[in-house]
Regions:
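Sequence signature of WD/YWTD-type beta-propeller architectures
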Residues: 2-3, 12, 18-331
């Protein structure tokens, strides 16, 4: 079994503490953190009013998410729900694993995710086929791997890799079957997502001291920063309409922001006061799913909400006694 330096472990926790509910009972300190919580604050800064967009149709498709089915033990599973809130069900069955970062394939037939094995103490990437529930482990001790996402053409998976002996997140690619692993760019980079045409990758990095978003071509060329945020966290998305959505803010003051893919037009879009985070666009680019605490401001209060891309028509999608978070929208 690998033994990791204490400093390495601490750095991994710091970099991955972007999205987990706080105060998870008896949680292993090396596990992913996804929705940090703290004391809500009452003072907020006004934001520009988003432009009014044409009304879209009702949301369609399905949203995969992390669900704390066993609240007290905090054993995270992967669940899925229809875009109208119906059909909520658990997908994963391995109670010895803790599951995170689900993402629906572009064809809607499968879900990829990262899972932590409490026995081997490693994160691996899996793919689960929705029709058969057949699950395949795609990686094997290549480091601690998370945030997998399938390319628009369905052939490639981008993901974050933490080396086993160095707490440095990097962005990698592999073929759909888990072979042909290669690094995109030799930089600190986490929470990657694809451009609509699959030619570029959006990711978060602190290469310039503060965490910001960057875009790079799949071949590692043309690296550039997009947007400028004071407290960027990580999990972002890039829509079919060429908009980028992300979240920024200190604990319990996080809000969603959208901008054009060149970084222009940056503005807050989430209703104030929900501690909103982890956004994901609908396939048509007209809606956003995200995690928030609008209705229950406490450690197990995070639920999945959706809204239109201009921040209107807020709807609560899940309603459970445990946390639902890390949504990713698919067809």
């Amino acid at each position: 079994m690998y033994k990791r330096p204490l400093l390495c472990i601490v750095l991994v926790i710091f970099m991955l503490a972007c999205n987990l509910p706080s105060h998870a009972p008896n949680s292993n300190p090396r596990l992913l953190a996804t929705l940090q919580a703290s004391t809500p604050l009452a003072v907020f800064t006004a934001a520009p009013v988003p432009p009014v967009l044409p009304a879209s149709t009702e949301p369609t498709g399905r949203i995969a998410l992390t669900c704390q089915i066993f609240k007290e033990e905090s054993k995270e599973q992967i669940c899925i729900v229809n875009a109208d809130g119906s059909g909520y069900r658990r997908l994963t069955t391995g109670d010895e694993l803790r599951h995170y970062y689900a993402s629906v394939a572009p064809d809607g037939q499968s879900v990829v995710y990262s899972a932590y094995n409490t026995q081997t103490e490693h994160f691996e990437i899996y793919e689960l086929h929705l029709l058969t529930n057949e699950t395949k482990m795609l990686t094997n001790h290549f480091g601690d791997l998370n945030a997998p996402e399938i390319s628009p053409d369905g052939k490639t998976i981008v993901f974050t890799r933490y080396y086993l002996d160095v707490a440095k997140p990097t962005t990698w690619l592999m073929d759909r079957d888990g072979t042909n692993l290669r690094q995109v760019v030799d930089l600190v980079a986490w929470d990657p997502t694809w451009s609509p045409d699959g030619s570029a990758i959006l990711f978060a990095s602190d290469m310039k001291q503060t965490s910001q978003l960057f875009i790079v071509n799949v071949d590692g060329t043309d690296l550039r920063q997009v947007g400028d945020f004071p407290f960027l966290r990580g999990r972002s998305d890039w829509s079919s309409q060429n908009l980028i959505v992300t979240y920024s803010g200190i604990r319990w003051e996080r809000e969603l922001y959208s901008m054009n893919s060149d970084g222009s037009g940056q503005q807050r879009i989430s209703p104030i006061g929900g501690n909103s985070q982890g956004p994901s666009f609908s396939p048509d680019g007209q809606w956003i799913a995200f995690t928030s605490y609008f209705d229950r401001y406490e450690v197990h209060g995070c639920e999945i909400y959706i809204m239109r891309v201009d921040g209107t028509d807020l709807r609560r999608l899940t309603d459970n006694e445990y946390c639902d978070y890390q949504p990713r929208w698919g067809p």
